[in-house]
Amino acid sequence: MRTALLLLAALAVATGPALTLRCHVCTSSSNCKHSVVCPASSRFCKTTNTVEPLRGNLVKKDCAESCTPSYTLQGQVSSGTSSTQCCQEDLCNEKLHNAAPTRTALAHSALSLGLALSLLAVILAPSL
């Protein structure tokens, strides 16, 4: 009995705790300091950042079973962007896209609006 207990204790020490990933989880750039222990099936911390001209910077951070890094530049009129970043270390997604580039998004919106109004004026202006 004593030998079985010693063997069980040695086995528990040798195997150690299960390896789980810790990631920051949030749905906006203002509250991205919340960290969680991910489910055992999650191998990645994933950060998705979408910049839309009228809505600004939309950030989503979470645990993910799979993750494919990407960068997408949307059409010239919307001039939005979307990116996904992946990492595999504890709390590695802390600083990924936390800064909200709202000034840039607003500048793009103003430029798009100016171009649209100029085009409209040219189309609707009477011939000179």
Swiss-Prot record:
Expressed exclusively at the outer cell surface of transitional epithelia and the keratinocyte of stratified squamous epithelia. A lipid is attached at N98 (GPI-anchor amidated asparagine). The keyword Glycoprotein applies. Its main location: membrane. Residues 1-20 form the signal peptide. Residues 99-128 form a propeptide. Disulfide bonds join C23-C45, C26-C32, C38-C63, C67-C86, C87-C92. It is found in: Cell membrane. GO terms for biological process: cell adhesion; lymphocyte differentiation; response to stilbenoid. Residues 21-108 form the UPAR/Ly6 domain. InterPro entries: CD59_antigen_CS (IPR018363), LY6_UPA_recep-like (IPR016054), Ly6D (IPR042339), Snake_toxin-like_sf (IPR045860), Toxin/TOLIP (IPR035076). Keywords: Cell adhesion, Cell membrane, Disulfide bond, Glycoprotein, GPI-anchor, Lipoprotein, Membrane, Signal. It is a lipid-anchor; GPI-anchor. GO terms for cellular component: cell surface; extracellular region; membrane; plasma membrane; side of membrane. The keyword Methyltransferase does not apply. PANTHER family: LYMPHOCYTE ANTIGEN 6D. May act as a specification marker at earliest stage specification of lymphocytes between B- and T-cell development. Marks the earliest stage of B-cell specification. This is Lymphocyte antigen 6D. It comes from Homo sapiens.
